[in-house]
C-alpha cells in the first residue's frame, strides 16, 4: 500500500503532498503520518521551509474522512503529534509552512490551511467551513480565521458555512 503522504526534499525545501484518492480526506492514520512528517521538518536544521499541497486539481482536502467516521473512527481519535493534519497543534514549529491550495478546501482541510503561514490558492480553489450545517463548530477555524481576516467576515463564514472562491479569499486577506 502506498503512503497517503509523499515528501520530496529540494535543498532546504520540503514539499509535502497529501495523496488520498478520491478527495484527499484525512483519517487518523493519515493525520499521524502528517504529524511525523512536520515534526521531522521542525527538527531538521537543514530544512528551512515546507510547502503543503495535495494531489490532483479538484480537491485540496475536505478535512476529516467521513467514510472513516462511518466505519467507526471517533471524531476525537488520536491524530498524533501536531493534532489533526499534523500542523494544528505542533509545538515549537518556528519555520514557515506555505500551503498551496489547488482545489476545494473545506472543513478540516481549510483549518489545516489556516495553520500554515502563507496560503497560495489556484484560481479555481474554494473554501468553506460547512460544519455549522451539521450542528457543529469548526473549532480550530473559530480561533484561527478571525486572526487572519476581519472578524465580521470570519463570523459569517463560521456561522453560515458559505463558500468563498479564491478571489474573495484574496480580497479578505487570506
Task: Explain the meaning of each model-derived region.
Residues 1-4, 35-39, 82-88, 105, ...:
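A generic local structural motif
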Residues 16, 52, 65, 112-113, ...:
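Hydrophobic/aromatic residues within transmembrane alpha-helices
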Residues 24, 57-58, 143, 155:
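Glycine-centered loop/turn positions within well-structured domains
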Residues 28-29, 64, 111, 140:
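Generic recognition of short, well-ordered alpha-helical segments
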Residues 30-33, 54-92, 133:
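Glycine- (often His-adjacent) and acidic-residue-rich active-site loop
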Residues 91-174:
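Crotonase-fold acyl-CoA enzyme core
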Amino acid at each position: 500500500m502506498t503512503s497517503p503522504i509523499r515528501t520530496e526534499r529540494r535543498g532546504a525545501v520540503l514539499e509535502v503532498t497529501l495523496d488520498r484518492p478520491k478527495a484527499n480526506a484525512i483519517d487518523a492514520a493519515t493525520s499521524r503520518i502528517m504529524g511525523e512528517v512536520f515534526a521531522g521538518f521542525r527538527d531538521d536544521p537543514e530544512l528551512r521551509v515546507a510547502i503543503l499541497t495535495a494531489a490532483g486539481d479538484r480537491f485540496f482536502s475536505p478535512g476529516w474522512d467521513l467514510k472513516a467516521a462511518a466505519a467507526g473512527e471517533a471524531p476525537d481519535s488520536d491524530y498524533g503529534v501536531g493534532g489533526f493534519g499534523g500542523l494544528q497543534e505542533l509545538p515549537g514549529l518556528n519555520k514557515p509552512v506555505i500551503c498551496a491550495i489547488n482545489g476545494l478546501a473545506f472543513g478540516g482541510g481549510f483549518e489545516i490551511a489556516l495553520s500554515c503561514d502563507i496560503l497560495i490558492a489556484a484560481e479555481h480553489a474554494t473554501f468553506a467551513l460547512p460544519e455549522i450545517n451539521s450542528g457543529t463548530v469548526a473549532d480550530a477555524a473559530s480561533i484561527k480565521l478571525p486572526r487572519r481576516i476581519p472578524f465580521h467576515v470570519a463570523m459569517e463564514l463560521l456561522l453560515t458555512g458559505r463558500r468563498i472562491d479564491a478571489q474573495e479569499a484574496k480580497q479578505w486577506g487570506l
